[in-house]
């Protein structure tokens, strides 16, 4: 089954690579319209997935990721329309010139070909990835989590109908609907057909892909994100950032999981933090230095376990650790961070500059929430993933990250001397 999907995707990629920007936008507009027109079918399928997932004990954080509402589905359709408005990187001449031989050489941006994406209970990913791949002339094979099988099937059917109505092959966007995990291992060896693989899931999935894949893999999406509260931070303003970073949507990978507090501000900061977190319903996981003081406040507090510094909670839980200084904070982030998103709250611009220079994450913030690490917020449109590695892409992966380049030499029957 997968080989036939690979063949279909590869053939479709040749067709997609020849489309003009106008033709690709026409397809995307059709997809957005059909997502809204067929919303009842998609929402009914999603309701069944959510009911099954709840019956099987899926966590509230994962249920939030899985669930679609009419407003969320409309937002997904609007995101597709936003992709239409983005500049098409395909065909862009990156650089070039005329060589001494007279050969005119240019480096031109082109599609990668076929993208494989493995992800969990995130139905919006199906549309986000498909729209970005189509905009860049790539075919895509999707393997969503078993929890979203009905939603993904309904969504991909809508996308394929839109493709066919525009005269394009359905093989441009395909989904593996069989939940058999053995198919993941088979997919990882499809280097004959898939040019790049993007796993969006937990550490176990990333490890599996790194160990078994014969396809180049872009890993990311695991966000053990930190905020360091420097001794010069403005407490009231810092709390606004922390509330946003923790509570706006706790189930996302750019949500803060560990708060590092400079010891010189702890006495005044921790009581205010406890009050704010109590109002926000956040459970604090405190180290020994912070525990007693936080227990005197209104927030729910437990003693942090050492392994929780490496946890991506994806819930209303927040580690709190007292650190001696900036060096101590940076050392903690280097030990426990996932190179996703980390922030410093400070009025000391020398400390801010050190933090920016020394924290090796894909996104580093000064006096801002980690929640900004997002393709839409960065002006990239929807994102395929947030890469936490350094090759071939880093940070939110928008359109340009789904392209490569080719060298083109144009001569007049030119030969090398």
From Swiss-Prot:
Give Gene Ontology CC terms.
cytoplasm
Query: Keywords for this entry?
Result: Amino-acid biosynthesis, Cytoplasm, NADP, Oxidoreductase, Proline biosynthesis
Instruction: Specify the pathway.
Output: Amino-acid biosynthesis; L-proline biosynthesis; L-glutamate 5-semialdehyde from L-glutamate: step 2/2
Q: Which GO biological-process labels does this protein carry?
A: L-proline biosynthetic process
Q: Which reaction does it catalyse?
A: L-glutamate 5-semialdehyde + phosphate + NADP(+) = L-glutamyl 5-phosphate + NADPH + H(+)
Q: Which InterPro entries match?
A: Ald_DH/histidinol_DH, Ald_DH_C, Ald_DH_N, Aldehyde_DH_dom, G-glutamylP_reductase_CS, Glu-5-SA_DH, GPR_dom
Instruction: Name its cellular compartments.
Output: Cytoplasm
| The EC number(s) this enzyme carries | 1.2.1.41
One GO molecular function term of this record is: glutamate-5-semialdehyde dehydrogenase activity
Q: What is its main location?
A: cytoplasm
Query: Which Pfam families does UniProt cross-reference here?
Result: Aldedh (PF00171)
**Task of the protein:** Catalyzes the NADPH-dependent reduction of L-glutamate 5-phosphate into L-glutamate 5-semialdehyde and phosphate. The product spontaneously undergoes cyclization to form 1-pyrroline-5-carboxylate.
**HAMAP family (alphabetical):** ProA
Entry similarity comment? Belongs to the gamma-glutamyl phosphate reductase family.
List the NCBIfam families.
Answer: PRK00197.1, proA
Name of this protein: Gamma-glutamyl phosphate reductase
Instruction: Give the originating organism.
Output: Shigella flexneri
């Amino acid at each position: 089954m997968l080989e036939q999907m690979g063949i279909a995707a590869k053939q479709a990629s040749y067709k997609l690579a020849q489309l003009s920007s106008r033709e690709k936008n026409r397809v995307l507009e059709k997809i957005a319209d059909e997502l809204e027109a067929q919303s009842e079918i998609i929402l009914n399928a999603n309701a069944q997935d959510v009911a099954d997932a709840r019956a099987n004990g899926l966590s509230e954080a994962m249920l939030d990721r899985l669930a679609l509402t009419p407003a969320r589905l409309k937002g997904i359709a609007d995101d597709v329309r936003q992709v239409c408005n983005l500049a098409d990187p395909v065909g862009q001449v990156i650089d070039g010139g005329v060589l001494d031989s007279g050969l005119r050489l240019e480096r031109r941006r082109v599609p990668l070909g076929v993208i494989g994406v493995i992800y969990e209970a995130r139905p919006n990913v199906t549309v986000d990835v498909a729209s970005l791949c189509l905009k860049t002339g790539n075919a895509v094979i999707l393997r969503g989590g078993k929890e979203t099988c009905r939603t993904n099937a309904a969504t991909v059917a809508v996308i394929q109908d839109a493709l066919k109505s525009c005269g394009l092959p359905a093989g441009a966007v395909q989904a593996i609907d069989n939940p058999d995990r053995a198919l993941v291992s088979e997919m990882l060896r499809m280097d004959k057909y898939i040019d790049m693989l993007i796993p969006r899931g937990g550490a176990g999935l990333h490890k599996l892909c790194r160990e078994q894949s014969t396809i180049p893999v872009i890993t990311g999406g695991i966000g053990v994100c930190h905020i360091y509260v420097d001794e010069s931070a403005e407490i009231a303003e810092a709390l606004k950032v922390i509330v946003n970073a923790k509570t706006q949507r706790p189930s996302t990978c750019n949500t803060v999981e560990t708060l590092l507090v400079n010891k010189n501000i702890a006495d005044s900061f921790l009581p205010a933090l406890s009050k704010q977190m109590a109002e926000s319903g956040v459970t604090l996981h405190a180290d020994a230095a912070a525990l007693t003081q936080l227990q005197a406040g209104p927030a729910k507090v437990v003693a942090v376990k050492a392994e929780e510094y490496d946890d991506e909670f994806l819930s209303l839980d927040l580690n709190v650790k007292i650190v001696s200084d900036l060096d101590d904070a940076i050392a903690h982030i280097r030990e426990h961070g996932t190179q996703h998103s980390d922030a410093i709250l400070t009025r000391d611009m020398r400390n801010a500059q050190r933090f920016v220079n020394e924290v090796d994450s894909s996104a580093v913030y000064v006096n801002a929430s980690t929640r900004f690490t997002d393709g839409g917020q960065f002006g990239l449109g929807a994102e395929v993933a947030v890469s936490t590695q350094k090759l071939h892409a880093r940070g939110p992966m928008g359109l340009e990250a789904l392209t490569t380049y080719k060298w083109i030499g144009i001569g007049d029957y030119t030969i090398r001397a």
